Amino acid sequence: MPLLNHLKEYRAKIGVNQQEMGTLAGVSRQTISQIERGDYSPSVTLALKIAKIFNVSVEDIFEYEEES
């Protein structure tokens, strides 16, 4: 799983649950859960929406890790 994310940590910082985060981002709670678990890689559009919610860059939330 080369795409790591810090979504859960950022979500905790602003005190929203997965359902509320999904509403803010325009997706379901299940999608947020899948992203946090690393089971789903968001589209570029969704990654940008999520970053905008936290007023940070996409790279602050999502990291690409090279496979060795």
Question: Language model features by range: what are they?
Answer:
Residues 19, 30, 59:
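Residues within helix-turn-helix
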Residues 5-24:
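Short basic helix-loop element that most often maps to the first helix and adjoining turn
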Residues 10, 24-25, 35, 64:
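Residues in the recognition helix of alpha-helical DNA-binding motifs
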Residues 45-60:
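DNA major-groove recognition helix of helix-turn-helix/homeodomain DNA-binding modules
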